[in-house]
């Protein structure tokens, strides 16, 4: 199984990156936290979780081992697959996730698309003790240094990313209307603003 990849970034989008490793392009699914940390181009190293299904082999990549550990912890829960685990990590940073699990904060957990009250309860029940043992403090804050794009292009990318995370179109349009999208705002900055509003 693939556990680590280092290569040149051939393509980067909010939900995946293509890493060119010695002429072979690997499509790696990533959470927003990893997207924020990756450069637009150049070399990158990702900690990989390989998911083998009947019809596909999918790679999920993370900037830190701790983030990967949280992902693996999430998929150990019945009913949480790799895509939903990635979406959870796209909506809430590991330190906040650990705190929500330890405090039994069902409201915060069930605010994540795809997580209902019963799933939130199951997450707390199964992961409350385990989450505290992971070193969530080693995860970077994720300050984004992104490319500047025309506002229309930024909003299109953000809208697409939010819909991919499970938010409904009317919800996304409402949030995008509230955002402050200055001409110099990057996709990363606008995504962070949108997720803050959606997680209230």
Curated annotation (Swiss-Prot):
InterPro entries: DNA_helicase_Holl-junc_RuvA_I, Hlx-hairpin-Hlx_DNA-bd_motif, NA-bd_OB-fold, RuvA, RuvA_2-like, RuvA_C, RuvA_C_sf. It comes from the Bacteria. The keyword DNA repair applies. It is found in: Cytoplasm. Residues 1-63 are annotated as: Domain I. Residues 143-153 are annotated as: Flexible linker. GO terms for cellular component: cytoplasm; Holliday junction helicase complex; Holliday junction resolvase complex. One of its GO terms (biological process) is DNA repair. Residues 64-142 are annotated as: Domain II. GO terms for molecular function: ATP binding; four-way junction DNA binding; four-way junction helicase activity. Keywords: Cytoplasm, DNA damage, DNA recombination, DNA repair, DNA-binding. Gene3D superfamilies: 5' to 3' exonuclease, C-terminal subdomain, DNA helicase RuvA subunit, C-terminal domain, Nucleic acid-binding proteins. Its main location: cytoplasm. Residues 153-200 are annotated as: Domain III. SMART domains: HhH1 (SM00278). The RuvA-RuvB-RuvC complex processes Holliday junction (HJ) DNA during genetic recombination and DNA repair, while the RuvA-RuvB complex plays an important role in the rescue of blocked DNA replication forks via replication fork reversal (RFR). RuvA specifically binds to HJ cruciform DNA, conferring on it an open structure. The RuvB hexamer acts as an ATP-dependent pump, pulling dsDNA into and through the RuvAB complex. HJ branch migration allows RuvC to scan DNA until it finds its consensus sequence, where it cleaves and resolves the cruciform DNA. Has three domains with a flexible linker between the domains II and III and assumes an 'L' shape. Domain III is highly mobile and contacts RuvB. Belongs to the RuvA family. Homotetramer. Forms an RuvA(8)-RuvB(12)-Holliday junction (HJ) complex. HJ DNA is sandwiched between 2 RuvA tetramers; dsDNA enters through RuvA and exits via RuvB. An RuvB hexamer assembles on each DNA strand where it exits the tetramer. Each RuvB hexamer is contacted by two RuvA subunits (via domain III) on 2 adjacent RuvB subunits; this complex drives branch migration. In the full resolvosome a probable DNA-RuvA(4)-RuvB(12)-RuvC(2) complex forms which resolves the HJ. This is Holliday junction branch migration complex subunit RuvA.
């Amino acid at each position: 199984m693939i556990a680590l990849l280092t290569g040149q970034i051939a393509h980067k989008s909010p939900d995946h990156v293509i890493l060119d490793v010695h002429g072979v392009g690997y499509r790696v699914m990533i959470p927003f936290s990893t997207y924020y940390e990756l450069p637009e181009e150049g070399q990158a190293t990702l900690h990989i979780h390989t998911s083998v299904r009947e019809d596909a082999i999918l790679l999920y990549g993370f900037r830190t081992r701790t983030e990967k550990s949280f992902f693996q912890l999430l998929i150990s829960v019945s009913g949480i697959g790799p895509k939903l685990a990635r979406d959870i990590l796209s909506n809430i940073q590991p330190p906040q996730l650990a705190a929500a699990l330890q405090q039994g904060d069902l409201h915060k957990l069930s605010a994540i698309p795809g997580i209902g009250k019963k799933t939130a309860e199951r997450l707390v029940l199964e992961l409350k003790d385990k989450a505290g043992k992971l070193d969530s403090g080693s995860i970077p804050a994720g300050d984004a240094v992104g490319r500047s794009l025309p506002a229309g292009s930024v909003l299109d990318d953000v809208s697409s990313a939010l819909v991919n995370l499970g938010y409904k179109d009317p919800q996304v349009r409402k949030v995008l209307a509230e955002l402050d999208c200055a001409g110099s705002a990057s996709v990363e900055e606008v995504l962070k603003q949108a997720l803050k509003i959606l997680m209230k």
